[in-house]
Regions:
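Bacterial N-terminal signal peptides
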Residues: 9-18
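Signal peptide processing junction and immediate N-terminal pro/mature segment
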Residues: 20-25
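Short beta-strand segments
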Residues: 121-123
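Active-site-proximal alpha-helix that buttresses catalytic centers in soluble enzyme cores
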Residues: 26-114, 127-129, 133-141, 146-156, ...
Length: 175
C-alpha cells in the first residue's frame, strides 16, 4: 500500500510511526528513506548546496521525534551530508553502503536492525529500489529534480511491508 501526503512537521512522522502495527515480541522495523538533498552540481560526487544544507536541517527537524537509531548513506558525500545534522544531534555514526546494492542494504537492515527505526539517504535512482527491496510496493520513480520525498516503510513481524509516501520541507519544483 502506498499513501501520499505532505509532511509539515515531525509530529506527522511520529504519528505514522505510532500507527505502525505493534508486535508483542518485537517492534516493527521502520525505515525512513529519502533522497539526498539538493547538490551544487551534476558532478559524480557533488556536495550539498546551501539549499540542500537547509533541507538537511529540515529533515533533522521532521525526524526529531521518530526514534531513529541507525543511519545509512551511500558512499557519496551528498548522501552522507544529508544525514550529518541528524548524526550530530543523536551522536550516531553514519553507516556507509554501496549505492548500487539496494538488496544488500535491505538484507543488512532486516538482519542487523530488526525492530529499530532506520534512516537511509539514497539517490533519485536508488530510493524506490530500496523501498522495494524492503518488501514494500515500489513507488513511481523519483525525478532528478525531486528532493522532498520521504518514504516510511514499516515491516511487521511476519515480513509484511507497507509504505507511506510523504513530502517534507519546501516543495521541489520541476525546472
Amino acid at each position: 500500500m502506498i499513501r501520499s501526503s505532505r509532511c509539515w512537521g515531525g509530529l506527522f512522522v511520529a504519528g505514522v510511526l505510532a500507527g505502525a502495527p505493534e508486535a508483542p515480541a518485537q517492534e516493527p522495523t521502520t525505515v525512513l528513506v529519502v533522497r539526498h538533498t539538493e547538490k551544487v552540481s551534476e558532478a559524480s560526487d557533488a556536495v550539498l548546496s546551501d539549499l540542500g544544507l537547509a533541507r538537511a536541517i529540515e529533515l533533522q527537524r521532521v525526524t526529531a521525534e521518530a526514534r531513529v537509531s541507525v543511519l545509512f548513506a551511500s558512499q557519496y558525500a551528498r548522501a552522507q551530508q544529508t544525514l550529518e545534522p541528524i548524526a550530530d544531534r543523536l551522536g550516531l555514526e553514519i553507516l556507509v553502503h554501496d549505492a548500487a546494492d539496494s538488496d544488500g542494504l535491505a538484507k543488512r537492515i532486516l538482519t542487523d536492525h530488526a525492530g529499530e527505526v532506520i534512516l537511509v539517504s539514497g539517490h533519485s535512482n536508488t530510493v524506490t529500489a530500496i523501498v522495494a527491496a524492503l518488501g514494500a510496493p515500489q513507488p513511481p520513480p523519483v525525478e532528478d529534480w525531486d528532493y522532498d520525498d520521504l518514504f516510511v516503510v514499516t515491516i511487521g513481524r511476519g515480513g509484511d511491508a507497507r509504505v507511506v509516501h510523504l513530502s517534507y520541507g519546501a516543495p521541489s519544483t520541476e525546472p
